[in-house]
Amino acid sequence: MENVQRLDCPVCGGKGTFVITSHQIDIPYFGPVLETTMICEKCNFRRSDVFPLEVREPKKYILKIESERDLNKRVVRSSSAYIQIPELGVEIKPGPLAEGFVSNVEGVLNRVDNILQTLIRWAETEEQKKKAEELRERIKKLKEGKEEATLILIDPLGHSAIIGEGVEEEILSEEEVEKLKEGIVIMDLDKDKEKEKE
């Protein structure tokens, strides 16, 4: 069932132009998630995220992209997840503007390619443009099955996953979780209660 709300836009102040759409979907081998999209019809501000509706452990997922078949593996990325492709030097960190999505490996590569296209337009030097164009070419080869790389998804909140055969999963240690949470805004009501008791 889809839930739609209209509010005033917190970005531009447009009256009733901020549309929040949320719906629950069930992802095989992951469980139910709430997918939320926020769009302002006036200023075009857009944000989306994915929230699992079941408690999950903080994990790291590792997938070797070795063939075109691997491009179809499902990726659930929440705004708290890190995405890495070490062979390409790609690291996408979570933050206030990070977006969650449900896609596949090819969709992740397309998102990286879109970022590179933007970098090419904004590049200040020819060297920066050349590096971005080389990375785009490597992504193209990955999608054609002519190159191999590793996709790593790390989520200290456990809200993300790579789903499919051949995916390695590692539960994160408490130390890893604390280190990764540094860049993420989290409201922990239990900690606030503990402080009140002191």
Swiss-Prot record:
Alphabetized SMART domains for the sequence: Zpr1
Keyword set, alphabetical order: Metal-binding, Zinc, Zinc-finger
Disulfide bonds: none
Zn finger (C4-type) start-end: 9-43
Magnesium keyword on record: no
Residues in the signal sequence: none
Keyword Ribonucleoprotein: no
GO molecular-function terms, A-Z: zinc ion binding
InterPro entries: Znf_ZPR1 (IPR004457), ZPR1 (IPR040141), ZPR1-like_arc (IPR004470), ZPR1_A/B_dom (IPR042451), ZPR1_jr_dom (IPR056180), ZPR1_Znf1/2 (IPR042452)
Superkingdom, natural source: Archaea
Family: Belongs to the ZPR1 family.
Protein name: Uncharacterized ZPR1-like protein MJ0530
Organism: Methanocaldococcus jannaschii (strain ATCC 43067 / DSM 2661 / JAL-1 / JCM 10045 / NBRC 100440) (Methanococcus jannaschii)
